[in-house]
Amino acid sequence: MTTHLEIVKNAIFATGAGSVDHYQHCAWQTLGEGQFMPLPGSHAFIGEINQLERVPEYKVEIICTEEQITVAVAALKKAHPYESPSYQAFRVESI
């Protein structure tokens, strides 16, 4: 069974992100608990309007090049089931 986690990761990997030297599909993921409250007008994948939800969620970290970041984020947004998925991008400098 393919989970949303794997669907989203594979969409990002398809952009070329997650490649390091002679390795592909490189990622770090940790399980945690997310919380949110859908407001009127939202189209929540899970949860009820005006009710606080707490759900198990994975935080996934994937490396990509500066040239890949825009397309990788677009792939994440398209594949993710949430209306507004959370993400962050950090520049990593080589030493």
Model-based region annotation:
Residues 1-95:
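Hydrophobic structural segments
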